[in-house]
UniProtKB/Swiss-Prot annotation:
Residues 14-76 form a coiled coil. Necessary for efficient RNA polymerase transcription elongation past template-encoded arresting sites. The arresting sites in DNA have the property of trapping a certain fraction of elongating RNA polymerases that pass through, resulting in locked ternary complexes. Cleavage of the nascent transcript by cleavage factors such as GreA or GreB allows the resumption of elongation from the new 3'terminus. GreA releases sequences of 2 to 3 nucleotides. This is Transcription elongation factor GreA. Disulfide bonds: none annotated.
Length: 159
């Protein structure tokens, strides 16, 4: 049992996965079943690209459903009321001075299952997330990233 991965997530992250799971089970499954029925009506399956496409989509969706169910079953929710304001952790919104970009950036530190770098939700397991966790306002840190070393100063922490 020790091989099971625990997914540390915020309430928002768990809700997002639950909503995706519900959509896949109630809407997407029905759509795919209908596509398969239509494709079967075309007859010969040996040269039926619609059927092959629908079956591939079905396999992908069923795989994603299993993945989401596993993630939710092994999710551990961060109590956002217990997120400290003096040290960076999962659930913290951290404002940093990025010396490379010469600008201030805000990151929400999340578990790996809900990371979304485009929206500044970075995983506690990513290089930057790992470098920020445990630090305090005023700390200046250098973090090894894939294209070198980035330097940040933690300006403030909120939730």
């Amino acid at each position: 049992m020790s091989g099971l991965k625990k997914y540390v997530m915020t309430y928002e992250g768990i809700k997002k996965l639950e909503n995706e799971l519900e959509y896949l089970k109630t809407v997407k499954r029905k759509e795919i079943t209908e596509k398969i029925k239509v494709a079967l009506s075309f007859g010969d399956l040996s040269e039926n690209s619609e059927y092959d496409s629908a079956k591939n989509e079905q396999a992908f969706v069923e795989g994603r459903i299993v993945q989401l169910e596993n993630m939710l079953k092994n999710a551990s929710m961060v109590d956002e009321d217990e997120v400290p304001l003096d040290i960076v952790g999962i659930g913290s919104i951290v404002k940093v001075k990025d010396y490379d970009l010469d600008e201030e950036v805000e990151y929400l530190i999340v578990g790996s299952a809900e990371a979304d770098p485009i929206n500044n939700k970075i995983s506690n397991e990513s290089p930057v997330g790992k470098g920020l966790v445990g630090k305090k306002p005023g700390d200046v840190i250098e973090i090894q990233v894939p294209d070198g070393v980035s330097k940040y100063k933690i300006l403030n922490i909120r939730r």
